[in-house]
Amino acid sequence: MALLSFLFNSKPKTASAAKERLQIIIARERNGRAGPDFLPALHQELIAVISKYVKVNPDDIKISLNSQGNLEVLDVNVVLPDDAIEAVK
């Protein structure tokens, strides 16, 4: 009987196993994109726009993208020089 069960044992189909592996790979790639590609370009554009109006050090502009559950929060922090604040008043 062991011989018959060995010969006719239902093994998982290779197509379904390959599909499952591919789904796992795709899910990992999607989760691996924690740092979006657009952040460096956005940082450069913000430096250009802010520099039009206020003389600011590019290192004083910080951008971060945080995920909280199913929400993504884009945090932009710009440290303005003291003389720029005085000019606005």
From Swiss-Prot:
Coiled coil: none
This protein's name: Cell division topological specificity factor
Alphabetic keyword roster: Cell cycle, Cell division
UniProt-listed NCBIfam families: minE, PRK00296.1, PRK13989.1
Xref: Gene3D superfamilies: Cell division topological specificity factor MinE
Biological role: Prevents the cell division inhibition by proteins MinC and MinD at internal division sites while permitting inhibition at polar sites. This ensures cell division at the proper site by restricting the formation of a division septum at the midpoint of the long axis of the cell.
Source domain of life: Bacteria
Pfam family, one: MinE
GO-annotated biological processes: cell division; regulation of division septum assembly
Family, as annotated: Belongs to the MinE family.
InterPro entries, sorted: MinE (IPR005527), MinE_sf (IPR036707)
